[in-house]
Swiss-Prot record:
Pathway: Cofactor biosynthesis; biotin biosynthesis. Homodimer. It comes from Bacillus licheniformis (strain ATCC 14580 / DSM 13 / JCM 2505 / CCUG 7422 / NBRC 12200 / NCIMB 9375 / NCTC 10341 / NRRL NRS-1264 / Gibson 46). The modification N6-(pyridoxal phosphate)lysine is found at residue 226. It comes from the Bacteria. The lineage of its organism: Bacteria, Bacillati, Bacillota, Bacilli, Bacillales. This is Putative 8-amino-7-oxononanoate synthase. Keywords: Biotin biosynthesis, Pyridoxal phosphate, Transferase. The keyword Transferase applies.
Length: 379
């Protein structure tokens, strides 16, 4: 059997289950409710100007890893800015948040250790756990009783690591980081938090879940590609942690460095984010309006005080029909299906940005009302 025949058979099963994916170019006439650019910084002229300046000075690419030819003043400046923003001693850049998670989890825990991972953690955390020499134990989503029970059972292990998303990307829920930190202290565990969807959004200055709860986890991971509006990932923590990762995290050592232009854009974004309190309040107001209105229409809406709004559909094929119907009405909002979410929990995932105006929100709600009735999801 040729490889294409075998793969075609597997793809046919994917299509039959309503789980087939394909790439499509965005349409300018559609309003984008799928973007993670929460503060609208990706197209901000100040970021573009900063990137252009670095582009002319350093060129389009970084030419190598940070440990060979790819280290520039912009990389080191951005790491200092991230450390200051996250209020840690130091920070280390990765080419993506995905690589940051994999790098941390595959290098820090050792054989004989245990990682306690939230049930709904991002795929990059799951993959990092799989690559670790430590065992992984999954605890129920945000269930502190279950986490404590599993911590108690792990007391004979050499070390215990609790890893959690700060904001869960498909559910819009917030990890109870204050409670996690208390359990970590009680059971002598280290805490690793992935703040990809919280950075720039949660906390008075947008510093993420650490600021939101007033705590200091051992390891803070994040991305520069969401609210920051640039590209790349990072780890923030103690100088010793960063020195260790620089020497042991394979996804840092063997990666090509983030382009200097992206570093320059991210530096400018971090300056802007700390002064964007009014924009964050506007964003949360829009989120509250949309969630309240969708519930009034008759939809089941999950999530907490974050820009991620999961509108539950259930059946994956209906979710795809719903998303396609919204596209015809000028609305871009993706259907999220297994294996990204559990069976029976397919949904339309809305992400709200500070750029959305009242007319955009009105059009969105009208589109949901019409599609909900068309598919007999609401009355």
């Amino acid at each position: 059997m040729r490889i294409d025949e075998w793969l075609s058979s597997r793809l046919a099963k994917t299509k039959a289950a309503g789980l087939y994916r394909s790439l499509k170019l965005p349409q300018a006439e559609r309003t984008n409710w799928a973007s993670n650019d929460y503060l609208g910084l990706a197209n901000d002229k100040r970021l573009i100007h900063a990137a252009e300046t670095a582009l002319r000075r350093f060129g389009a690419g970084s030419t190598g890893s940070r440990l060979t030819s790819g280290n520039t003043a912009w990389h080191e400046k951005l790491e200092r800015k991230i450390a200051g923003f996250k209020q840690t001693e130091a920070a280390l850049l990765f080419s993506s948040g995905y690589l940051a998670n994999v790098g941390v989890l595959s290098s820090l825990p050792e054989k004989g250790d245990v990682i306690l991972s939230d049930q709904l953690n991002h795929a990059s955390i799951i993959d990092g756990c799989r690559l670790s020499k430590a065992d992984t134990v999954v605890y129920r989503h945000k269930d502190m009783n279950d986490l404590e029970e599993k911590l108690r059972a792990a007391q004979s292990r050499a070390r215990r690591f609790i890893v959690t998303d700060g904001v869960f990307s498909m559910d819009g829920t917030i990890a109870p980081l204050d409670e996690i930190m208390l359990l970590a202290k009680q059971y002598r565990a280290f805490v690793i938090v992935d703040d990809a969807h919280a950075t720039g959004v949660l906390g008075e200055a947008g510093r993420g879940t650490s600021e939101y709860f007033g705590v200091s986890p051992d390891v803070v991971i994040g991305t520069l590609s969401k609210a920051v509006g640039a590209e790349g990932g990072f780890v923030a923590g103690s100088k010793t942690l960063i020195d260790f990762l620089l020497n042991h995290a394979r996804t840092f050592i063997f990666q090509t460095a983030v382009p200097p232009a992206s570093c320059a854009a991210a530096c400018k974004a971090l300056d802007i984010i700390e002064d964007s309190r009014a924009k964050r309040r506007l964003l949360q107001s829009s989120v509250n309006t949309i969630k309240r209105s969708l519930v009034d229409i008759g939809f089941t809406v999950n999530g907490e005080d974050t820009p991620i709004i999961p509108v539950m559909i259930g059946d994956p094929q209906k979710a795809v029909q719903f998303a396609n119907g919204l596209k015809e009405k000028g609305i871009e909002a993706p259907a999220i299906r297994p294996p990204t979410v559990a069976e029976g929990e397919s949904r339309i995932r809305l992400t709200v940005t500070a750029e959305r105006r009242l007319k955009d929100i009105e059009d969105l709600l009208e589109g949901f009302k019409l599609m909900g009735r068309e598919l007999n999801l609401v009355k």
